Amino acid sequence: MNTLGRFLRLTTFGESHGDVIGGVLDGMPSGIKIDYALLENEMKRRQGGRNVFITPRKEDDKVEITSGVFEDFSTGTPIGFLIHNQRARSKDYDNIKNLFRPSHADFTYFHKYGIRDFRGGGRSSARESAIRVAAGAFAKMLLREIGIVCESGIIEIGGIKAKNYDFNHALKSEIFALDEEQEEAQKTAIQNAIKNHDSIGGVALIRARSIKTNQKLPIGLGQGLYAKLDAKIAEAMMGLNGVKAVEIGKGVESSLLKGSEYNDLMDQKGFLSNRSGGVLGGMSNGEEIIVRVHFKPTPSIFQPQRTIDINGNECECLLKGRHDPCIAIRGSVVCESLLALVLADMVLLNLTSKIEYLKTIYNEN
């Protein structure tokens, strides 16, 4: 399927080397001021070609809004938008058009659909994630109206872990590093991978918090069984190319702890810790929502690799083209956008949780 969300639904379309990619965001309430500067900035954060640590492919990534906006406000109807592909180079893939690139989706897409779109991976390309960032910008505009902000940064590259988290520094960092002291070592790890015609994995940290420092997030976003907030977050993140694991709060470390070590104790002011990552019973508990997203190394590397062609013959694959040496860097921005989309969807879902909410709306009329 090509749709994310239930009440705020994003449907995406397009391929890496097609004329356009785009999306339809359905369910956006009317009356939200469209922040074009925010939209442009979000696209630039994900944009390639900015430095040596990401792909050289630099698309303009101008978002063309085709519907759902009138006089700079959302109308309540589906927001349609297009992003033009202007710098695709399909010739870079001529030498591998009948080969399966190791650890790419070529193999599974071919066997599922019987079509070999060799041009940059087609629909399975990370190029599609630009649509999610654009849609995430609209979701952020909605969340801002109720005091919620999403942030992201890199906490690990090639096993080099951040010891401190500074989201303001991440905005200034070429690799969105959260720890300024570890940034140079992380950059060196990427540069060494590039020198060796290789790639490297990484981990992004995504969080949602209240815009005001003295306030909490809304309690009760999500539902207790089949629309659990943490499940929907994990689903959205795992749907992104290259993501191999998602943790909420302490995540994997939770399995190593005793209950007395893990439990978030409480007093009259609230929780004394946040090992749960802001989610209890599938619903937000008011604390910051903390998500860690683990990315595999980019499968596109410039080393000879053993593979097979579409006829099953063994052969050697040597790639050309423009690729991210570490997909976690730009991927962190996409994950931030996905968290915004999930939270906006849960905010709209929550309107049905109490009759008082409906009475508030309809008694005013």
UniProtKB/Swiss-Prot annotation:
One Pfam family here? Chorismate_synt
GO process terms (BP): amino acid biosynthetic process; aromatic amino acid family biosynthetic process; chorismate biosynthetic process
Q: Name one GO cellular component term.
A: cytosol
The cofactors named for this UniProt entry are:
FMNH2
| Note describing how the cofactor binds | Reduced FMN (FMNH(2)).
Q: How does it assemble?
A: Homotetramer.
Protein name, entry field: Chorismate synthase
Query: Which species is this record about?
Result: Helicobacter pylori (strain ATCC 700392 / 26695) (Campylobacter pylori)
